[in-house]
Amino acid sequence: PLNWNIAPTNPIYIVRANDPFGKDIKGEKALATVSWGLIGPWLTEMQEARASQSRAINARSESIHEKPTFRNAFRSTRCLIPASGYYEWATALGQYRPKQPFYISARDGLQLPIAGIWSSWTAPSGEVIATASIITQEAQGELETIHSRMPVFMPADRWDLWLNPRNTDVNELKSLMVVEQPESIVIARPVSDAVNSVANNGKELTVEAPLGEPET
């Protein structure tokens, strides 16, 4: 079923290389379901892993190749996260009231392909749990008036290079994550505070709502 208000650790879809170990030279892709928020590979206890997962829903493009939680996945198991859109809460002082929610979606009405990384973690029970994180960068253009960060939107002509597990050149991978002029890709509209509760879930959450007054 469609989920219009995804919370950390909820299931999300990813597109990944069909053969994450790089033996398939055809570059075929596979759709998979994972849990949102990467689990650090060194963790051994479920409670600790879930707590860590909630803190790792996003990975910064500037440091992803260095952070212990993310660096191995960045080098070998990258993915695309297809999304109808995403919510962001205003932090820019003076322009919008604090925590004014916005829904940001593709201008063409299609799916937004967001850059991500994924990994598998084995729980103490032996269960293998696949998890993923969204990659973010400094906000650009109009999105900068809402929040200081934004997802890395991955153009179609970069998908094959991004998903190829044999592509381990850090500089090339970092160059793929550079996105400028996001306003040509996405459009933002203010929405109701109803999205603040994960108990609310429906397409109506994405309907444009009047802007709240900024605090003075």
Regions found by a protein language model. Give the residues of each.
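Short, His- and charge-rich active-site/binding loops that engage polyanionic ligands
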Residues: 1-78, 105-109, 115
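Short, catalytically relevant binding-site loops at active-site mouths
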Residues: 86-88, 110, 120-121, 141, ...
